[in-house]
Amino acid sequence: MTPTDQRAPLPPIPRSRRGVLSRALSCLATAATVAALGAVLHPAAPAAADTGYTWGNVEIVGGGFVPGIVFNQSEPDLIYARTDIGGAYRWNPDTERWIPLLDHVGWDDWGHSGVVSIATDPVDTDRVYAAVGTYTNDWDPNNGAIKRSTDRGRTWQTTELPFKLGGNMPGRGMGERLAVDPNDNSVLYFGAPSGHGLWKSTDHGATWNEVTNFPNPGNYAADPSDVGGYQGDNQGVVWVTFDPSSASPGQVTQDIYVGVADKDNTVYRSTDGGATWERIPGQPTGFLAQKGVFDHVNGLLYIATSDTGGPYDGSDGEVWRYDAATGAWTDITPADPDGFEYGFSGLTIDRQNPDTIMVVSQILWWPDIQVWRSTDRGATWSRIWEFSGYPNRTLRYDHDISGAPWLHFNNPDRPPEVSPKLGWMTQAFEIDPFDSDRVLYGTGATVYGSDNLTDWDSGGTVHIKVRAQGIEETAVQDLAAPPGATELVSALGDIGGFVHEDIDVVPDAMFDTPFHGTTRSIDFAELAPATMARVGEAVSGEVDSHIGISTDGGSSWWAGQQPPGVTGPGTVAVNADGSRIVWSPDGTGVHYSTTLGSSWTASTGVPAGARVEADRVDPDKFYAFANGTFYTSTDGGATFTESAATGLPARGNVRFAAVPGHEGDIWLAGGEANSTYGMWRSTDSGATFTRLGDVDEGDVVGFGKPAPGKSYPAVYTSSKINGVRGIFRSDDAGQTWVRINDDQHQWAWTGAAITGDPDVYGRVYIGTNGRGVVVGDLTGQPGEEPEEPEEPEEPEEPEEPEEPEEPEEPEGPGEDASCAVSYQVVNQWGNGFQGEVTITNTGDSAISGWELKWTFPGDQQIAHAWNTQLTQTGADVTARDAGWNSTIAPGGTASFGFLGSTAPGTAPSEFTLNGESCS
């Protein structure tokens, strides 16, 4: 993830000052010891059964930088991956998916979702360790920590460190900084950033001591002039590796190699188990050793160097081999015949055939990364692609992205560039130590892999495909869940966003025309949901417009015009019937359009930079909020009037939303610690607000389908309520709340976006900052929503009912059965209404498949329906089951809803269900 993208969602805790860290360090003894703080257990269970919810992700697959992949050296198929802001994962060989391991990280310790290093124990393979912390500057108020697990990451204990760590800082792809002694696995080493040196544990990571005799804490910063900023930190001690042959099992390994971010002194060694250290004589200078890998069979250390720590840059570098027996260094840098200059990273050894090594360019943006392979210890090299008459290239690989088809980034082939790219930011590149044919590597957006790597050596084609299934790493900026067939629309950092027709299926392509690298805000017309607008960061060379508009539910988009002075996306709102758009962009004031973005007029009465939203019922109403003041427009965004309401938060992360089906009903959440912070509701279009007393800290709020028997939408929020931080749902407009997540499912910072599903009661979508779009469903949906098994027992054949029915005709209520129909108008406005129909089976046998018919006595017209397949011809209406709600048990119900585009008129009085009259 880029640093800019991750700063956009403000941290939930006030940022600390740099002086806090210096004061803490001044209190430490020379050989500081860090004890386990309370040995806090953090289980990472697969489900939150006690809350009645199951949790998963909207399927995107990847979406962020994977800087580290680590294979266990003793157990096949035990593999871990680390991300810069989205936690760590373990590979599940049975499902071929990655399992998230750090979802227990919560709101207050959100920085622990950034993983700077991970280590898997080669002796006790159930043990795994993670060094966590996201920023070393004051963006992250908390110190870093070392987490340890004895059950492969299912549960964790945490030891806090007296300094910060930078999982999303420059140099994060170097490593691994954390390493387990392969002979005495109670011993671990950790290379720290920021000048804090080398640290050691002798009790399986429970306590840590600084290795005070280690001579060099590093001195390289990406930009030394950026003091206290993102680029200004000393990248420190960057990797540790062992020669396991230098000791017997149970003894401390004697030969230890350490990489340091110092271009003149980049590799150190101990030959006495860490008692003393020396700079290895004769080593190359002028570059940083990004990676160090030891071949213990032949006694050789390989290093891949670059002129920076990456991951975005690196214009020069070398590859060297060190012979531990003779002390000789040999330059084995592959020579690029095309004259490209780049650093090197992604260094790996084939442990089955240790003469085989591979390295990757760090970094080559155009035309693509280069991968080099040697089968003779670097004496000769071959590369994965080469020019065959410019602009054509000969590729040693083919590329299957069917697992995440959006990875082409909407780009066609533009020789010599091909789409998708082979990779970028590839600092993690690892050959399976048990299988020479298998390789996994990380990029800025995914994990790729191959299972036939050695075909390279015989002139064959290496088959590369997506291997990121289960990793969900996007940073969510906004979410919208329209009623109807489309389940969700996402606005994401780095990869733009998607229209999700099915949340269990990876979308084919991200937003296009215009393509936005990061989409900040998205909205749809509540009564005409096919009309949508989104705003995002323009990408140089693609299109200059920050706004995209669709009238077909996101199937296609066009770039809107921009008012003069626009410099960034801001926020956007679409009115209830899709006839107007209000846009509050960066760089200029609020504007409105009545032409779907082809022209704009400045709004008055509202400050520039205000956050805007639309009323979900009245197409003439828009709302805005800025600096503690609420504004309302009743003329389609032309003019806004300042509300007299006081006591609203003027600072912090403030979000608000209007309630579908309820005109003038607004919920506002946000604020800042040690200041005004909470949740407020208005039922008079913002004229007055009432604070919800139970909400201590409100951060984001959204709405979904009402609970059975209720007419008001379910309310969802990420907040602290009655002293407890979590994800909550209210089925009674905020009178009572139930926490629906648990401590094992917190997903760090969740303050950007939340929404319920308008068609499925209980379903909630949660935006995270690095764990993608989390989706929660009730374990057993009440009433019409049957629970679906995770894996159908017989996917090839439909399940037969206990008593076979005639497939060509749905079963009626039966001779002794009966039914009742409730038809209600649950909301209405000037030119429309919302209806809800409930079918009750009052008979003794189940109804399997239903078709309800009625005739409107007036000129009512239905514009949209949900939970049913509905058609209307003149006044005659036919509503059929939606498939999943086809069976109504005795005493059970099935409900569906619709929006009418006329006045509600007189309600129908006669209904037939499967041809039988129904009361």
Label the predicted regions.
Residues 3-5, 28-791:
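Extracellular glycan-interacting surfaces
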Residues 8, 44, 793-802, 843:
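Residue-level detector of intrinsically disordered/flexible regions characterized by low predicted structural confidence
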Residues 8-31:
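N-terminal export and membrane-targeting signals
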Residues 24, 769-772, 888-894:
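Extracellular interaction modules
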Residues 782-816:
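Ser/Thr/Gly/Pro-rich low-complexity, disordered linker/stalk segments of secreted
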Residues 809-919:
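Extracellular low-complexity, O-glycosylation-prone Ser/Thr/Pro/Gly-rich "stalks"
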